[in-house]
């Protein structure tokens, strides 16, 4: 019954807020454009769905301008609405499984190349640093400034 009491409290609070807003002619800026519709799943759980009213034409225009679903990412062929679109990494559309597979292989090769280059840089720095010079070139720490003799 706890879940049901929460739903009832929310409904009563929303009604009270609406009555207060109408009586005071003060609008709560947070409640404008938000529709709250609680749904009881069972006695212990509640789902509150909120829908914020927005200008859908701006959203449509944004997606239409992006154009990532208009052309294949690899071969730049036009993607047709009646054909399947193959996605990779969430924002790359491909016209076929082959194009998507080629891109995956190219990305894998690029990551391996970067990893290899970074390993070579580390090895190069390791051999170039004076701290790792062969022992015959190192000075005895007792002969350095600040050292002491026995």
From Swiss-Prot:
GO terms for cellular component: P-body. One of its GO terms (molecular function) is zinc ion binding. Residues 12-28 have a biased composition (Low complexity). It is found in: Cytoplasm, P-body. It comes from the Eukaryota. InterPro entries: Zf-FLZ_dom (IPR007650). Pfam families: zf-FLZ (PF04570). Residues 12-31, 129-150 are annotated as: Disordered. A zinc finger (FLZ-type) spans 67-111. Its main location: cytoplasm. Keywords: Cytoplasm, Metal-binding, Zinc, Zinc-finger. Belongs to the FLZ family. May act as an adapter to facilitate the interaction of SnRK1 complex with effector proteins, conferring tissue- and stimulus-type specific differences in the SnRK1 regulation pathway. PANTHER family: FCS-LIKE ZINC FINGER 15, FCS-LIKE ZINC FINGER 5. Interacts with KIN10 and KIN11 via its FLZ-type zinc finger domain. Interacts with KINB1 and KINB3 via its N-terminal part. Forms homodimer and heterodimer with FLZ1, FLZ2 and FLZ7 in vitro. This is FCS-Like Zinc finger 15. The lineage of its organism: Eukaryota, Viridiplantae, Streptophyta, Embryophyta, Tracheophyta.
């Amino acid at each position: 019954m706890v879940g049901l009491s929460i739903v009832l409290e929310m409904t009563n609070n929303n009604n009270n807020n609406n009555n207060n807003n109408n009586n005071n002619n003060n609008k709560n800026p947070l409640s404008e454009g938000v529709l709250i519709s609680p749904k009881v799943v069972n006695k212990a759980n509640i789902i509150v769905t909120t829908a914020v009213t927005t200008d859908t034409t701006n959203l449509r225009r944004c997606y239409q301008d992006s154009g990532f679903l208009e052309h294949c990412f690899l071969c730049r062929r036009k993607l047709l609405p009646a054909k399947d679109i193959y996605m990779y990494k969430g924002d790359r559309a491909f016209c076929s499984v082959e194009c998507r597979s080629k891109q995956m292989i190219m990305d894998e090769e690029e990551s391996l190349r970067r990893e290899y280059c970074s390993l070579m840089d580390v090895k190069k720095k390791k051999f170039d640093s004076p701290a790792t010079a062969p022992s015959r070139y190192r000075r005895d720490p007792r002969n350095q400034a600040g050292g002491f003799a026995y």
